[in-house]
UniProtKB/Swiss-Prot annotation:
<feature type="glycosylation site" description="N-linked (GlcNAc...) asparagine">
    <location>
        <position position="1402"/>
    </location>
</feature>
<keyword id="KW-0813">Transport</keyword>
<feature type="transmembrane region" description="Helical">
    <location>
        <begin position="1337"/>
        <end position="1357"/>
    </location>
</feature>
<keyword id="KW-0067">ATP-binding</keyword>
<feature type="domain" description="ABC transporter 2">
    <location>
        <begin position="828"/>
        <end position="1070"/>
    </location>
</feature>
<dbReference type="GO" id="GO:0005524">
    <property type="term" value="F:ATP binding"/>
</dbReference>
<keyword id="KW-1133">Transmembrane helix</keyword>
<feature type="compositionally biased region" description="Polar residues">
    <location>
        <begin position="804"/>
        <end position="821"/>
    </location>
</feature>
<feature type="binding site">
    <location>
        <begin position="864"/>
        <end position="871"/>
    </location>
    <ligand>
        <name>ATP</name>
    </ligand>
</feature>
<feature type="transmembrane region" description="Helical">
    <location>
        <begin position="1433"/>
        <end position="1453"/>
    </location>
</feature>
<keyword id="KW-0677">Repeat</keyword>
<dbReference type="Pfam" id="PF14510">
    <property type="entry name" value="ABC_trans_N"/>
</dbReference>
<dbReference type="InterPro" id="IPR029481">
    <property type="entry name" value="ABC_trans_N"/>
</dbReference>
<keyword id="KW-0325">Glycoprotein</keyword>
<protein>
    <recommendedName>
        <fullName>ABC multidrug transporter atrI</fullName>
    </recommendedName>
</protein>
<dbReference type="InterPro" id="IPR027417">
    <property type="entry name" value="P-loop_NTPase"/>
</dbReference>
<feature type="glycosylation site" description="N-linked (GlcNAc...) asparagine">
    <location>
        <position position="1460"/>
    </location>
</feature>
Length: 1472
């Protein structure tokens, strides 16, 4: 469809005649639908259907009243469904019901927007942490540097208009759209700015009508496990108006709108398919983009901003999308501002207005049809066949723009000069007159528009909704819909839920069996306490995993809040509600098994109290961790807080350190600890009202009379053979049963309090801030033009700060670099390539007998509709697939591919994956060092890297750090680096490129394709996928391979001059002729998208039967014959070298290079290293001062052991800090570096293991200093040295254990679950919580296998050996000896065989007996001996070595050989 075929709405309103449409039906004076019917495709009509169904009217239609509502043509699910009739019927009904039209305009004057940031940033390193206190900027507490992003914009957009926003990446397009739509988080609008919507100030609009102005982000954000149908039905439901068509219910309306909008965007077949994301399999990327568009369309906003929403869509689909917006604006009076980086002429012609941005300055705003003439008058030349959009963008590119002859000295050069020219132009003056008139009109209307908006909103709002609320639904209705969606997510993710359920069951079985058979006597006191401690702790701490899940969904909730779908707090409430049954199941699985297996109190009331408290504490701690996620900005902040909190909660529960032994500086923590109150309830519930038989008396003599004996347990009374449970818990924990229901009330108060904080924080902290883009440089390597404070672009003509590959001003320099590319002679061919995979047990063919070749010196384009298999074919040809079955032939010079094929090819992936901490030059050097042959010297490789930098014109940012988008290279610079990394490798065979122009503006796309053309002319063989080529860009290619859906070849062969060869082939099979000014690429996509030619013949079948297809096969045969002879003669003359080896460099040279890079990366991750060190220091200090100066009592001795135990408790946090970084490294290696055969997997694994060790050693030293002296004071030097060695060893083990766990696993979540399980088992079986003698016989092997058994034993023996024990009053057993005997005489026989000592041996009453004399006596009872300390030290090293060996083995088996976790080998792809 072309803009010229569309009759403007205003032209229809001037006539009062009645005519007939193409169907012979009458239409009246206001029927734009009928007028446009001939040019509306079915998909477009469906989009109109959706829009017309909203609470507005297109026009007054009275001639369709006689169509029955039961007519099949009005049923979207009926095969006879007639969208045209349905649309007219809907419009008629809406008009009869008096639903008002949604109209709004945008007016902005002197719009100036700033953000935080500076021209450049310096990369932070570990050295910066050390030197920070000595640098001046550290102590500068003033506000962050403000950077102006948009300078003085003026304009207005009326209802029914489309505005195209043009500018290069970084020019401010996204900021402009965000500002118009009120997405101002992190942005500051100047107070002099005037910005209103039909007279309504922006502040009022955002507060009361947020859903009327919406912004579509460039990135797709959805709940991945929801289906497309569920996602869109939810969007329809939350924006369902109160007044609906034909008395439909809310559910009926939402379902109808969902079905219609899915048909509009071609998504009907995906109704039950998960949306998916980068890690969850779902719909393809192009369809996911359409889901985003459909979701925002269902918002029904009259004002919409679309930020590069055509990214990832082919040109035909992109055109249809913009045509839909055009029709929506005309028929529904909506207004749309659209930023498009690659706009075809057909797309551009659909817009009413255009705005051009140049480095944040407005250099044109006005009619789109006059923009080209404006810049030509300014003095710029528009080349033939260049689209208007490309031309307008090109004038902002100093390298690409061309002045008209004679105008070179008169045209503006800098952004400020362009802006000055615009402000002096007649077009600007005309705009000012229009704006003045509009301002006068809106001023005269007063509050009419505001009242109109409010009235329209009230008609749409549900009852009980606050009038000033921007939402259509009441809070209870929002909670209901969010809860329904939450349950859908739980059900769709049931595999994860079941995994957690099974894990909890296994953990309960393990812990329960460890304490199985605990006696109901005093010997079981400690075990019962430990059981309940585990019960409350494991129930409480499972909620920590919710932090990650909340952060993963936060961007989605933010987006929905911006659409005015619901309050973020209502989603938080729904999440808690949906958790109730899940947590209930988890509680049943864990608590019932643990309770009865461990032999806790078998009474109904006690069991139900136990279950109630453990269930409540799950929700209390869930609220605590959710609150942490809500009040923080990053997941690392939340996890750091959680790690410290867990330590505090565990130590101050009252079990590890009883209340009476808590030091005053930290004692307050237990009052704020919910687990403390829960633990007291469980202990009191278990022990209250019970008398426990004494297991051991002091002394153990037969027939003891009166009070001459006492039970060895705390709370015992002399002369009694039982011990009161209440007395025991009072003496041991200072607990009382009277506190049970008080504590329950406190837990409920904690639950309510934290839930309220969580809901409020979620509502208030639900927006991500924006900041200005900035380059990051290494300290001391800043470019001079930025170091001196100048903004990039101050000298555009010199290319300062510019990143485009030169094609004119820098051409000579670039050509000199390209000539250094070695000439190529090899030809890559493939024949009848077929690729089959299984999806849900069903076979699916992705490639169907594809044949072709790539010759040196040729540039071949690979094109096709979305989902045709372009990237799949590249992956198959490059041998990068890891599943499915491949058949067919692939040859180089007629010979089968060898192991060196992948390293001899370059593969530029669509995703720009690079090491964030490296600079551009370092990234290129790393590629050159490892991928160029070992025979080439380091100096030569580095020299070639400099040539690549010149070729790609990257000198200005060669020392810039890759970073992340916003703080680092921009999209264009990243793409250039991706290409540069492959060029630095000097690929000998060919270069694959997958969508190298995706996300780039037209000028950057042209520059990159022009550069590829030059590479091809220099002898490089190139195969490149591309989906939105302009006519000029398309002409750069020599050959085309075009695929239809299903990977079926439609054409392979030369494109020809002006695409004549290609067009001749297609036109010979019946479709319409391609117009002279039409883009051949768009013509071809349109023709093939139809599926068949006008005669009904399938394009794939036509190709197979064509003489061109036969010619392809004959040419492949000819290539094979001619090249085989050449290859044989070469092989006979060339000596053997590494030519056919898998890697260019041998392993012993790879390892140092990779290790240095990883060391460099760690040095440049100060936040990671600081977080690691702070965790160690804080944990060490906290543990040290919690067990400060452990005294000589029994509890003091236990405190030392528990301090060692608590050091073990930070193990899980340490490991989970390391795992995400390893995954980041592994993702880069496995996605880009390993497929390119850059270096061996062995070098990757060993380097990552080595680099962690120095930091772990430093951490061990710091923790030793913080912990050891606080607990033990100064002991002998040999003990200090050994404890230091144990600390260092512990942290080294943590890093190797992390590598061991994550080596084979796919993600951090799975690894985290396994770490938690293994860590829990290691702690359970290390002999502290349950002595070896008390363990059931089955589990004694776990005591011996647990690494912490040896570490805790070594640490405890070293610290406690030889320490005298002096019992405290509570620990002393007091009894009276028989008359006439002293305590010493009475106890002599007993003390001859039992440990312990008397405090008053000569007393004749109240004997005070301490059950131990020295700590070694207790240590021996738990199988810890001073003599075995060095043995334990050596055994723990064996675990370190074991972890390293198994990590390497697991990586090889599961990540290299691709075994699955069913212990079978995955079916590998194979080429016949």
């Amino acid at each position: 469809m072309r803009r010229s075929n569309v009759v403007p709405v205003h032209s229809l309103t001037s006539s009062t005649n009645t005519g007939r449409d193409s169907r012979g039906e009458k239409y009246d004076e206001l029927t734009p639908v009928a007028t446009r019917r001939a040019s509306i495709s079915p998909d477009e009509a469906r989009y109109l259907t959706q829009l017309a169904s909203r609470d507005n009217a297109v026009s007054r239609v009275s001639t369709v009243a006689d169509i029955s509502l039961d007519d099949p043509a009005l049923n979207p699910e009926n095969k006879d469904f007639d969208l045209y009739k349905w649309l007219r019927k809907v419009v008629h009904v809406l008009n009869e019901e008096g639903v008002p039209r949604k109209e709004a305009s945008i007016f902005f004057q002197h719009l100036r927007v700033s953000g935080t940031g500076a021209a450049l940033q310096l990369q932070k390193t570990v050295a910066d942490i050390i030197t920070a206190p000595f640098r001046r900027e550290t102590w500068n507490f003033r506000n962050k540097t403000s950077k102006t992003i948009l300078h003085d914009f003026n304009g207005m957009l009326h209802s029914g208009e489309l505005l195209i926003v043009l500018g290069r990446p970084g020019s401010g397009c996204s900021t402009f759209l965000k500002t118009l739509s009120g997405e101002l988080h992190g942005l500051n609008v100047d107070e002099k700015t005037v910005l209103h919507y039909s007279g309504i100030p922006q502040s009022t609009m955002i507060k009361e009508f947020k859903g009327e102005v919406v912004y579509n982000q460039e990135v797709d954000k959805h709940f991945p496990h929801l289906t497309v149908g569920q996602t869109l039905e939810f969007a329809a439901a939350v924006r369902t108006p109160s007044k609906r068509l034909g008395g439909m219910s809310r559910n009926e309306y939402a379902q109808m709108m969902t079905k219609v909008v899915m048909a509009v965007f071609g998504l009907s077949h995906t109704y039950n398919t998960k949306v998916g994301n980068d890690t969850v399999r779902g719909v393809p990327g192009g369809e996911r983009k359409r889901v985003s568009i459909a979701e925002m369309a269902l918002a029904g906003a009259p004002l919409a901003a679309w930020d590069n929403s055509t990214r990832g869509l082919d040109s035909a689909t992109a055109l249809k999308f913009v045509e839909s917006l055009r029709l929506a604006a005309d028929l529904n009076s909506s207004a749309h501002a659209v930023a498009i980086y690659q706009a075809s002429q057909a797309i551009y012609d659909l817009f009413d207005k255009a705005v051009v941005l140049y480095e944040g300055r407005q250099i044109y705003f006005g009619p789109a049809s006059k923009a080209k003439a404006f810049f030509e008058r300014q003095g710029w030349f528009c080349p033939p066949r260049q689209t208007t959009g490309d031309f307008l963008t090109s004038v902002t590119n100093p390298i690409e723009r061309q002045a008209r002859p004679g105008m070179e000295s008169q045209v503006p050069r800098t952004a400020a000069e362009f802006e000055a020219y615009w402000l002096e132009s007649e077009e600007y003056k005309e705009l000012q007159r229009e704006m003045a008139a509009f301002q006068g009109e809106t001023s005269s209307q007063g509050n009419e528009k505001l009242l109109e908006f409010q009235q329209r909103k009230r008609l749409a709002q549900a009852s009980h909704t606050r009038p000033k609320s921007p939402y259509l639904l009441s809070i209870p209705m929002q909670i209901k819909l969010n809860t329904k969606r939450a349950y859908q997510r739980v059900w769709n993710e049931r595999t994860s839920t079941m995994t957690t359920f099974i894990g909890n069951t296994i953990l309960a079985l393990i812990v329960g069996s460890v304490f199985y058979g605990t006696p109901t006597a005093t010997a079981g006191f400690y075990a019962k306490g430990a059981t309940l401690f585990y019960a409350v702790l494991l129930n409480a701490l499972t909620a920590m995993t919710e932090i990650n899940s909340l952060y993963s969904q936060r961007p989605i909730v933010e987006k929905h809040a911006s659409f005015a779908f619901y309050h973020p707090a209502t989603e938080a409430i729904a999440g808690v509600v949906s958790d109730i049954p899940v947590k209930f199941l988890m509680a049943i699985a864990f608590n019932i098994i643990l309770y009865f297996l461990s032999g806790l109190r078998r009474e109904p009331s006690q069991f139900f109290i136990y279950f109630l408290i453990t269930f409540i504490i799950m929700f209390v701690m869930s609220a605590v961790f959710r609150t942490m996620a809500a009040i923080t900005r990053t997941v690392s902040q939340a996890m750091t807080l959680a790690g410290v909190l867990i330590l505090m909660l565990v130590i101050y529960t009252g079990f590890v350190v009883p209340v009476n032994y808590m030091h005053p500086w930290f004692k307050w923590i237990h009052y704020l600890n919910p687990i403390f109150y829960a633990f007291e309830i469980l202990i009191a519930n278990e022990f209250h009202g019970r008398e426990f038989t004494c297991s051991q008396f002091i002394p153990v003599y037969p027939n003891l009379p009166g009070d001459s004996f006492v039970c060895s347990s705390r709370g015992a009374v002399a002369g009694r053979r039982t011990v009161s449970g209440d007395a025991y818990i009072e003496a041991s924990y200072s607990y009382s049963y009277s506190h049970v229901w008080r504590n329950f009330g406190i837990l409920i108060a904690f639950l309510i309090g934290f839930m309220v904080i969580y809901f409020v924080a979620t509502e208030l902290n639900s927006a991500t801030t924006s900041s200005a883009e900035v380059l990051v440089f290494r300290r001391g390597h800043e470019p001079a033009h930025l170091k001196n404070g100048h903004e990039p672009g101050a000298d555009e003509e010199a290319g300062a700060g510019k990143t485009v590959v030169s094609s004119s001003a820098e051409e000579n320099k670039q050509d000199q670099g390209i000539t250094s590319i070695p000439p190529q002679q090899d030809i890559f061919t493939w024949r009848d390539v077929v690729y089959d995979i299984e999806i849900k047990g069903e076979p699916r063919r992705l490639l169907d007998h594809v044949s072709g070749w790539v010759k040196p010196g040729t540039l071949t384009a690979l094109m096709g509709v979305s989902g045709a298999g372009k990237t799949t074919l590249l992956d198959v040809l490059a041998h990068r697939t890891t599943m499915g079955v491949i058949t067919g032939d692939m040859f180089v010079n007629g010979k089968p591919l060898d192991s060196s094929f992948q390293r001899k090819t370059g593969y530029v992936q669509q995703q720009d994956l690079h090491l964030e901490t490296a600079t551009v030059r370092e990234s290129l050097r790393f590629s050159a060092m490892l991928r160029q042959p070992a025979s080439v010297s380091k100096e030569e490789k580095y020299a070639y890297v400099e040539e690549v930098i010149k070729m790609l014109n990257m000198e200005d940012f060669a020392e810039a750090v890759v970073g992340v988008p916003g703080e680092g290279l921009n999209v264009e610079q990243r793409k250039l680096l991706t290409i540069g990394v492959e060029l630095a490798a000097k690929p000998k065979l060919l270069l694959f490129l997958d969508e190298p122009t995706s996300g780039l503006d037209s000028q950057s796309s042209w520059a990159i394709c022009n550069f590829l053309r030059k590479l091809a002319d220099a002898g490089q063989a190139i195969l490149c996928t591309i989906h939105q080529p302009s006519a000029i860009l398309f002409e750069q290619f020599d050959q085309l391979l075009f695929l239809a859906r299903g990977g079926k070849t439609v054409y392979f062969g030369p494109i020809g001059e002006n695409s004549q060869t290609l067009l001749k082939y297609f036109e010979s099979h019946g479709p319409r002729r391609c117009g002279d000014q039409e883009n051949p690429a768009e013509y071809m996509l349109e023709v093939v998208n139809a599926g068949t030619n006008p005669r009904g013949e399938n394009w794939f079948d036509l190709w197979k039967a064509s003489k061109e297809a036969a010619g392809v096969q004959a040419e492949i045969d000819r290539i094979h014959e001619s090249k085989r002879g050449e290859a044989e003669s070469k092989d006979s003359t060339n000596p053997k070298d590494r030519e056919h080896e898998e890697f260019a460099m041998p392993f012993f040279k790879q390892l140092p290079i990779v290790t240095v890079r990883v060391f460099q990366q760690y040095w440049r991750l100060p936040m990671y290293i600081a977080a690691k060190m702070m965790l160690g220091i804080c944990a060490g200090l906290f543990i040290g001062f919690s067990f400060f100066k452990a005294d000589t009592s029994l509890q003091g001795m236990q405190n030392v052991i528990f301090s060692v135990f608590m050091l073990c408790a930070i193990f899980s946090s340490l490991v989970q800090q390391i795992i995400p970084l390893f995954i980041t490294q592994r993702a880069l290696y496995e996605v880009r570096e390993r497929p390119s055969k850059t270096y061996s997997w062995k070098a990757f694994m060993i380097a990552n293991i080595i680099v962690e060790i120095p930091y772990q050693i430093l951490m061990g030293i710091l923790v030793f200093g913080c912990y050891y002296y606080a607990v033990n004071g100064v002991q002998s030097s040999d003990r200090q040295g050994l404890v230091l060695l144990f600390c260092i060893q512990f942290f080294i083990y943590a890093s190797t254990f992390a590598d061991f766990v994550i080596a084979a696993l796919p993600d951090a979540e799975t690894a985290g679950a396994i770490v938690t399980l293994q860590f829990s088992m290691a702690l359970t079986f290390n002999g502290v919580m349950q002595t070896p003698e008390a363990l059931p016989g089955f589990w004694i092997f776990m005591y011996r296998v647990s690494p912490f058994t040896y570490w805790v034993g070594g640490m405890a023996a070293t610290q406690l050996h030889g320490r005298a024990v002096k019992c405290s009053a509570a620990e002393t057993a007091i009894f009276n000896p028989p008359s006439g005997l002293t305590c010493q005489e009475y106890m002599a026989d007993y003390m001859a065989v039992a440990p312990g000592h008397l405090s008053n041996p000569n007393a004749t009453s109240s004997c005070e007996f301490c059950s131990l004399s020295v700590a070694d006596q207790y240590l021996a009872s738990v199988n810890i001996y001073w003599s075995e300390r060095w043995r334990n030290f050596g055994i723990f090293w064996a675990y370190v070595v074991f972890d390293i060996a198994v990590a390497v083995m697991l990586y090889y088996c599961f990540r290299v050989k691709k075994w699955n976790f069913s212990f079978g080998k995955r079916k590998k792809s194979k080429a016949a």
